[in-house]
Swiss-Prot record:
This is UPF0282 protein APE_0500.1. It comes from the Archaea. InterPro entries: RibonucZ/Hydroxyglut_hydro, UPF0173_UPF0282_UlaG_hydrolase, UPF0282_hydrls. Gene3D superfamilies: Ribonuclease Z/Hydroxyacylglutathione hydrolase-like. Belongs to the UPF0282 family.
């Protein structure tokens, strides 16, 4: 099984796009990317804009190579919203647009899947709480819809995914933010056997703590990452996305590494997983613009 993180916040864009090769299949998970229109009262730096185009190009290439595409929810950094035609001709496992979904995501999903004609032209399966067993021994399991972070958030719900091939599994928990609620944690802990090769998860949004998200939820997300390290025990725990938007993210990861080491779990950002130095350009936006002034 091969796992490539195509784009992520530690790679310079808002994303957690992932590409998996397993049991003869190529699977694109949440292949999309975006950037914050304003951060620190500043627009995106040209370097961010270039990185976004590069990330979207990689996402398109990986989607074209995929037999299977997965969309865990309909936030714009998780799918190629303006290019539904790229999803035709492959199996698309997507969040149900008719249940356990907020108004915004329902509208986006309807526009993308139904209004575009993709449902009629493509092979679309709503994946909530379902298990797909394919020829060659590939199994793709989906959680029930869980909160996008703290319980009751207006951001709605997302799906988590486990991909298993020949007794080897990976788990993908996009936008659960730690998770920032215990229901999502319990769902993840059900997937402890076989021990995951890698868990790719969005960390808590420290940059929004006490502002748009309660600090109690952020702290719960950090604690739940520690629980996952000790009880789910993935061989590699990739924590990225929302967490990396705060310059304090290395401190959180260092604390997590201290707890995870005893369980034999390696903690990494997406960039580190890919053998690269983290470049969270959104977090660096002030410095990037100051460099222009100099």
């Amino acid at each position: 099984m091969r796992v490539e993180i195509v784009a992520a916040d530690s790679l310079g864009v808002r994303s957690i796009a992932t590409f998996v090769e397993a049991c003869g299949y190529s699977i694109g998970v949440d292949l999309g990317a975006s950037i914050a229109p304003r951060r620190f009262s500043l627009p995106p730096h040209p370097r961010e804009l270039r990185r976004l185009e590069q990330a979207l190009d990689r996402a398109r290439r990986r989607l074209e190579e995929s037999n299977i595409a997965i969309i865990t929810h309909y936030h714009y950094d998780h799918y190629l919203r303006d290019e539904p035609e790229l999803y035709a001709g492959r199996l698309l496992l997507a969040k149900d647009i008719n249940r356990s979904i907020n108004r915004s995501q329902r509208f986006r999903g309807y526009r993308f899947l139904v209004k575009s004609g993709l449902v009629e032209r493509g092979r679309v399966e709503y994946a909530d709480s379902r298990v797909f067993r394919l020829e060659g021994g590939l199994t793709i399991e989906f959680s029930k819809p869980v909160w996008h972070g703290e319980e009751g958030t207006k951001l709605g719900k997302v799906l988590m995914v486990r991909i298993t091939c020949e007794g080897v599994s990976i788990v993908f928990a996009s936008d659960v933010q730690g998770p920032g609620n215990n229901e999502a944690l319990e769902e993840l802990l059900k997937w402890s056997k076989p021990r995951p090769l890698v868990l790719i998860i969005s960390g808590p949004p420290l940059y929004l703590g006490g502002y748009r998200v309660g600090m109690s939820s952020v702290e719960l997300g950090i604690r739940n990452l520690e629980v996952l390290a000790e009880r789910l025990r993935p061989k590699r725990l990739v924590v990225d996305h929302h967490l990396v938007r705060d310059p304090r993210f290395p401190e959180v990861l260092e604390r997590l590494r201290g707890r995870a080491a005893g369980a034999g779990v390696e903690v990494l950002t997406a960039a580190e997983y890919m053998g690269l130095r983290p470049e969270p350009l959104e977090t660096m936006r002030r410095e990037l613009w100051k460099g222009e002034e100099g």
